């Protein structure tokens, strides 16, 4: 069976051109990931010559453990501000990133949207409701499995498994060139560097991705083997991908943050940013079959 036709009872379907265009793009950008079993977490002690971990203790990558996943599809690109605008416009919601710092990022076309966790979750679920497809945020396990091209023992989710500034991830100078008008930019337009072997872009660069899971420091010690979805509750959500440098860019590195980002303010109380431009996301479709474009 191939998913593709919209459900006859799709929720609140908006026939606007912008929504139709977004749905076409969202489906066309999906990469099918065949399910399988892999060793999730820091595989350094088991695979490297010196038997040392890749991930420092503050990256929560241990212990490595076996995980089995069903097949799914994941977007090759992060969601952009243009994509997110189509969603908020369709629901008559105010557009995001209009404050002093955030608005500078959205002025550059195809820049990843910086959002809070609930906004990312709601966007993916909305895509599911208007398309009839089981869209959602990826689980942490799905994200790492796809980043490592179906669980290969590669430390970085780049075209060659290495982190090479200026070649497969952006250098500081390249970020400045792509994001003129933004001081010390953290993200830049999507798809500017080669994808990983699975065909996914910006998995080791260009900000982090929110995933579905609540964060627990010790979750790996008792994670279920099949299709783990993280703890039942928590206070922080997991983010994957690069935050600051080559260490946080490791495919096994885990980051945590409160679902609602605390606004940045000036001394006089003026809010200059109510989201973090570095907090992006992409969606998955939880179907065992490929999705028709």
List the predicted regions and their residue ranges.
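Extended beta-strand/loop cores of jelly-roll/beta-sandwich
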Residues: 1-141, 150, 264-293
């Amino acid at each position: 069976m191939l998913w593709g036709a919209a459900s006859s009872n799709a929720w609140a379907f908006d026939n606007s051109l912008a929504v139709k265009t977004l749905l076409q793009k969202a489906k066309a950008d999906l990469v099918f990931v065949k399910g399988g079993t892999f060793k999730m977490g820091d595989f350094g002690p088991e695979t490297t010559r010196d038997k040392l971990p890749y991930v420092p203790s503050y990256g929560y990558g241990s212990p490595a453990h076996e995980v089995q996943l069903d097949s799914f599809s994941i977007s090759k690109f992060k969601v952009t501000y243009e994509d997110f605008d189509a969603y908020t416009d369709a629901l008559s919601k105010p557009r995001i990133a209009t404050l002093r710092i955030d608005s500078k990022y959205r002025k550059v076309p195809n820049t990843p949207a910086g959002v809070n966790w609930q906004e990312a979750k709601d966007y993916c679920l909305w895509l599911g409701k208007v398309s009839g497809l089981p869209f959602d945020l990826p689980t942490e396990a799905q994200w790492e499995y796809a980043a490592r091209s179906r669980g290969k023992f590669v430390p970085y989710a780049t075209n060659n498994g290495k982190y090479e500034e200026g070649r497969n991830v952006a250098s500081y100078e390249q970020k400045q060139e792509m994001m003129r008008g933004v001081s010390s930019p953290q993200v830049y337009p999507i798809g500017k560097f080669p994808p990983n072997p699975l065909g996914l872009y910006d998995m080791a660069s260009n900000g982090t991705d929110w995933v579905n899971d609540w964060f627990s420091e010790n979750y790996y010690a008792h994670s279920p083997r099949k299709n783990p979805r993280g703890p039942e509750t928590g206070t922080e959500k997991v983010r994957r991908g690069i935050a600051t440098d080559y260490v946080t860019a490791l495919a096994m590195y885990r980051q945590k943050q409160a679902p609602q980002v605390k606004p940045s303010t000036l001394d006089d109380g003026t809010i200059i940013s109510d989201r973090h431009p570095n907090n992006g996301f992409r969606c998955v479709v939880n179907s065992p079959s490929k999705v028709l474009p």
